A protein has these predicted regions:
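Short C-terminal tail/terminal secondary-structure segment
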Residues: 2, 104, 149, 227, ...
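Alpha-helical segment proximal to the catalytic Tyr-Lys
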Residues: 129, 173-174, 247
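Substrate-binding pocket helix/loop in short-chain dehydrogenase/reductase
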Residues: 100-101, 108-113, 201, 219
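Active-site helix of classical SDR
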Residues: 124, 160, 168
């Protein structure tokens, strides 16, 4: 059976753990050769080795800070040196820091924008240079439901994600003539992910004055389908967007939220 992404070459930023690692594994299972890019090189190497061992696909790990343009350029050069082309960029690297606006440290607010929006721009810029030359390519940003609706005491993250959708649409318009499609995926709450378990439950419980379990139940109650988002939910959409099945889709920001954005 032909795999949807057979012999495509993909870069996944933020690929060392959590959703990023799950994306790398799924792309490899679909036949892609994957560069696992992350600030955490050790984690990227583990993900790369596991994905290759489980699928037989070629993978590679690369250390990158997506806010450093020279490092992003080096990441693209690495992909070309290893695999000779670049078909898919999944811009997944991101951070989330929440807090009340009146007490939000400006440097932390700026850090969220730098990673989530400026980092996406840099990766898309240098991937686009290659894809324009090839006459084909797919750029996918991992956005959020917070890119479409304001988020309580989460102004930096929401601002970065709203900006990401604007950037996605603008790049889609600019690159369409070159055969390059640009889309975003807007996941709901990945309640069982390391991001939530290790960080967000604690942040939100503190900011909202409730327990971590009450935070979980609050967010589940907001979802018409009454469950959290899973990695498979997100990856099903990523694979579709990266494949030829989505050849007529560009400039879209697809919700994967169980209907939460309607509440």
């Amino acid at each position: 059976m032909q795999k949807l992404l057979q012999d495509r070459v993909a870069i996944v930023t933020g690929g060392a753990q959590g959703l990023g690692a799950a994306i790398c594994h799924r792309l490899a299972r679909e036949g892609a050769q994957v560069v696992v890019a992350d600030l955490n090189l050790e984690g990227a190497e583990i993900t790369s080795a596991q994905a290759s061992a489980q699928t037989g696909c070629r993978t590679s790990a690369f250390k990158v800070d997506v806010t450093d343009e020279s490092q992003v350029e080096a990441m693209i050069r690495h992909a070309l040196a290893e695999f000779n082309r670049l078909d898919i960029l999944v811009s997944n690297a991101g951070i989330l820091i929440s807090g009340p606006v009146e007490a939000f440290p400006a440097e932390k607010w700026r850090a969220v924008i730098d990673v989530n929006l400026y980092g996406y721009f840099l990766c898309a810029k240098h991937a686009a240079r290659v894809m324009i030359g090839q006459g084909s390519g797919v750029i996918i940003q991992i956005n959020s439901k917070s890119g479409k609706k304001g988020s309580y005491k989460n102004s930096a993250y929401a601002a970065s994600k709203f900006g990401g959708i604007g950037l996605t649409q603008s790049l889609a318009l600019e690159l369409a003539d070159h055969g390059v499609r640009v889309n975003a995926v807007c996941p709901g709450n990945l309640l069982d992910s390391p991001l939530w378990v290790d960080s967000l439950f604690k942040q939100y419980a503190r900011n909202q004055g409730i327990t971590e379990e009450e935070v979980r139940q609050k967010y589940i109650a907001q979802v018409p389908l009454k469950r959290g988002c899973t990695y498979d939910d997100v990856n099903n959409v990523i694979v579709f967007l990266a494949s030829d099945q989505a050849s007529y889709l560009t400039g879209q920001a697809i919700n994967v939220t169980g209907g939460q954005e309607m509440r």
